[in-house]
């Protein structure tokens, strides 16, 4: 299973909603894929972020995992270099309208 598949599965396992994967490789030289997903509350958002980190660790992912946002954040960004994941509490996703 590749990194993208691991991330998508980790989001689904924690009931992430409206998961959309974008190929942004033609738009930016820094990222190949952007994933946007929603959760119903802060607790679920954090559970998704934690599950992504744990599943990557279990798969022996050796790349850097950078995260912006903490347990009180309604938007968590996980930067895996070639993949960037945006996790939003549902209402916040509509405010920023990335997709």
Regions found by a protein language model. Give the residues of each.
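Polybasic/polar functional segments that serve as interface/processing modules
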Residues: 1-30, 42-75, 90-92
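Short hydrophobic/aromatic beta-strand micro-patches
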Residues: 36-39
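C-terminal structural segments of small proteins and small subunits
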Residues: 76-99
């Amino acid at each position: 299973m590749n990194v993208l598949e691991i991330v998508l599965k980790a989001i689904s396992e924690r009931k992430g909603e409206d998961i959309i994967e974008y190929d942004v490789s033609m738009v930016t030289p820094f990222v190949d894929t952007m994933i946007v997903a929603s959760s119903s509350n802060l607790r679920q958002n954090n559970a998704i972020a934690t599950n992504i980190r744990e599943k990557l660790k279990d798969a022996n992912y050796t790349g850097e995992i950078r995260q912006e946002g903490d347990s009180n954040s309604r938007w968590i960004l996980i930067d895996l270099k070639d993949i960037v994941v945006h996790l939003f509490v549902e209402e916040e996703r509509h405010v920023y309208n990335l997709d």
